[in-house]
Amino acid sequence: MARSPVEPPASQPAKRAAWLRAELERANYAYYVLDQPDLPDAEYDRLFVELQRIEAEHPDLVTPDSPTQRVGGEAASGFTPVVHDKPMLSLNNGFADEDVIAFDKRVADGLDKATDLAGTVTEPVEYACELKFDGLAISLRYENGRFVQASTRGDGTTGEDVTENIRTIRAIPLTLKGKRIPRMLDVRGEVLMFKRDFARLNERQRAAGQREFANPRNAAAGSLRQLDSKITASRPLSFFAYGIGVLDGADMPDTHSGLLDWYETLGLPVNRERAVVRGAAGLLAFFHSVGERRESLPYDIDGVVYKVNRRDEQDRLGFVSRAPRFALAHKFPAQEALTKLTAIDVQVGRTGAITPVARLEPVFVGGATVTNATLHNEDEVRRKDIRIGDTVIVRRAGDVIPEVVSAVLDRRPADAQEFVMPTECPECGSRIERLPDEAIARCTGGLFCPAQRKQALWHFAQRRALDIDGLGEKIIDQLVEQNLVRTPADLFNLGFSTLVALDRFAEKSARNLIDSLEKAKHTTLARFIYALGIRHVGESTAKDLAKHFGSLDPIMDAPIDALLEVNDVGPIVAESIHQFFAEEHNRTVIEQLRARGKVTWPEGPPAPRAPQGVLAGKTVVLTGTLPTLTREAAKEMLEAAGAKVAGSVSKKTDYVVAGADAGSKLAKAEELGIPVLDEAGMHTLLEGHAR
């Protein structure tokens, strides 16, 4: 069903109502029949409320087939239609506390409950409260305790026969238990998929190379409406009973809560997250309690449901149009909404990660007004085909950062622009680089970039780096936020008067920090390299670089081929080191650190190149515990013979020396057919080299 023509303005109510009806019907068809919802709930609700308002203001515009007069879509071909003996109606919705208070007032008035002079209800109504599941509504028919038929809600009057598929759901009893078994019982409830089961299902889909489901609701609906019940049987579906249709041969419980208690005695699954409360205050307390726990629930819900508890009071209140007067669905703030994407900027993280960020026309979603949403990375923007000018679906759940889920392609304007990742950092102008096989692009100005300033300073001061005692995160925050320190070099310009002026920084603390900074000026080359915070360069690699080159300048000027000669440095690490020193901003900060004797270290000649021999150019991996040699001693012997000692096994590994308790490295070597030596074999190899 194609999307409706151009949206008419509100000043033309007849055309506007016709457009709204067509748009809602199209959305209903996608939701109920195709199981491919393409309109967020909040947008559907907004359009539905607008149509209700227009029809209330212009009764002559109401049509018999208006969505306000019925519930949802048609039966899909391939399933036998089932006419419900008692219609499966939807509920009126409430979105704010005021809607709940108004509902309680209407109910109290309808039941002639006592009120005071101010109109406040003094005889509170008793309500049954339960969760509103985000699944698929169904009706189960039992005859003399045996399950005989299941049908979907469909349009509320006619649904689809899904009996064989429902039989596969283990949570649904095929035979009722207990003593009060009715001749006929229609159980109303919801088929859903728990979050953990949804995650496992998508894992299976990925492993099989099949399409993943967008959310548990889509997975449940798609599973239930399979023509092949074997597919349904393989899907982890669940069920909760919450209502009743036809009942014959047994007494109807006096209350709704009593009905659910009776269902439990019959062996039907009933959700335990329910309560009986009194008045609007009780309803709102239940709503807010559930809202606080919503994210931790094992299944998705989109609100709670209130029902007048006493059956006789339900009968007195009756129904209006498409919904009962005695019930209300109180929805949580929508987690998805439509809005326009006006621009895509990039944001620089503390580690230099470049993240595309969508700038949005303000939209209320997930309980807050959202104007920005993450696009994660460049690949995600391409995969989702999101462009500037698109109408997009934005999702915000709980405290999760808002994200753009997808673009609404048939609303894309002709002038929509594709996103182009910038080549320079917007914060500092340094080059943006993206290493092979990495999804994240990064700013290369690690020592200079304002966005990375706090992280760079914190790493620089670490105990294993320059070990600047007393320079913690809170002090760094103050120094950066007061613009006292921009780069690590600025730390060594800090004076006593500057430090004592900081919040909660006593004279003794200031003197101690100045002493630590003075001490940090005398370090080692390995510590200094590590302190620079070069991506992928840890303590061990920093030591290997210092040992191999002997001084800093050769490292800064080394081409990638020269870096690859360093022990344990592979292509990714070599590329990262090369990029760091190729960025002029980083070199400037390093020169500032070295200028006027600020930071010094003893330098020496580069490590002697290993003599040529059987191990020259060979890569060896050590694993396990050797009988007589420590790992370090064995490494020195191998390197002296010209070998490169690596930390992991790959196709480029020439030998693996294995001792006791060798683990995955030994297994990998055997899998790749790499020669494995014990300590004696290593000595034999070295002796062969010596000769």
Swiss-Prot record:
Annotated NAD(+) binding sites: D41, A42, E43, Y44, D45, S90, L91, E130, R153, E190, K307, K331
Keywords: DNA damage, DNA repair, DNA replication, Ligase, Magnesium, Manganese, Metal-binding, NAD, Zinc
Pfam family, one: DNA_ligase_OB
Named cofactor requirement(s): Mg(2+); Mn(2+)
A GO biological-process term: DNA replication
Keyword Magnesium in record: yes
Binding-site residues for Zn(2+), renumbered to this chain: C425, C428, C443, C449
Positions of the BRCT domain: 610-691
One Gene Ontology CC term in the entry: cytosol
Database matches in InterPro entries: BRCT_dom, BRCT_dom_sf, DisA/LigA_HHH, DNA_ligase, DNA_ligase_AS, DNA_ligase_CS, DNAligase_adenylation, DNAligase_N
CDD domains, alphabetized: BRCT_DNA_ligase_like, LIGANc
Gene Ontology MF terms in the entry: DNA binding; DNA ligase (NAD+) activity; metal ion binding
EC number: 6.5.1.2
Catalytic activity reported: NAD(+) + (deoxyribonucleotide)n-3'-hydroxyl + 5'-phospho-(deoxyribonucleotide)m = (deoxyribonucleotide)n+m + AMP + beta-nicotinamide D-nucleotide
NCBIfam families with a match to the protein in the record: dnlj (TIGR00575), PRK07956.1 (NF005932)
Protein name: DNA ligase
Lineage, uppermost ranks: Bacteria, Pseudomonadati, Pseudomonadota, Betaproteobacteria, Burkholderiales
